Amino acid sequence: MFKKLTVLIMVCAMLFVFVCGCTQKTDEPTEYIGIISAMDNEIDLLLKEAEIDHVDTVADVKYYVGSLCGQPIIITRSGIGKIRAASGVTTMLNKYNISKVIFTGIAGGVADEAQVLDEVIATRLVEHDYGILSNDGFKWRSGDPGFGNEPGAYYECDPDLLQLAYDAAVDVLGEEHVFKGTVATGDQFIANSEYVQKLRSDYDAYACEMEGAAVAVVCLQYNTPFVVIRALSDKADGNAHESYENFGDVAADNSSRIVMKMLNAMGE
């Protein structure tokens, strides 16, 4: 009887250890890839192709939790502009276990060689509207806005994600339609040829948009790798509004296809 009881206790102990071990593994938080954009049409294709488990809503912003191309993902549309983009990615990084961030969407073209529907993969980002406005005009100031120091004017994308995005874009669009370079961020929709030339000469920019640098700053603060990919819907000139209306959805889908190509490559 004593031997049977001893064996029973040992079996129970082994089962307890096994169950605890399994529970511990199950409780490990899932690592997600964060995908963020500014507008609905920039994530429509991704949501159509994704398997969404559930949707969390924080401060009226929806976070779609699920999988895409075999990868666990969180997809969100932050809204337009630097403030909304910073808020959206901050919430994402605080609420979920995010391993890396991909910002996808459309932009205005700045470089002469980059045409509508071409893709720009950001090597770095800069806030072109950060500076001092005096009687002498606007003077751009380098540095990290809000901190009073000057660690550098540009925010560098993660080199591994940058290369992954570039390779994916080349596969989707062809090498002649893909560029790597600086993306300039500001809280304006640029439709002015003269200002486009300034962005090119002052920052060596290839594209301009309204969110990327804000996402970059937050990701750097959280030590989270990130990349920004932008399809050109217009040339940020006097015809920008018309071009955006004609090509915005197609450009947005191009960026989404590149994101999916990246996710597939991550699983190889």
Where are these regions (language model features)?
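Short, solvent-exposed secondary-structure boundary motifs
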Residues: 14, 52-58
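Secretory targeting signatures
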Residues: 1-25
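Short, conserved "active-site rim" segments that organize catalytic pockets and cofactor/ligand binding
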Residues: 30-50
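Glycine-rich phosphate- or other oxyanion-binding loops that anchor nucleotides, phosphorylated ligands
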Residues: 29-33, 57-268
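Short amphipathic alpha-helical "recognition" segments used for binding
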Residues: 7-8, 22, 46, 213-215
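Generic "edge-of-domain/loop-turn" microfeature
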Residues: 6, 16-19, 42, 73, ...
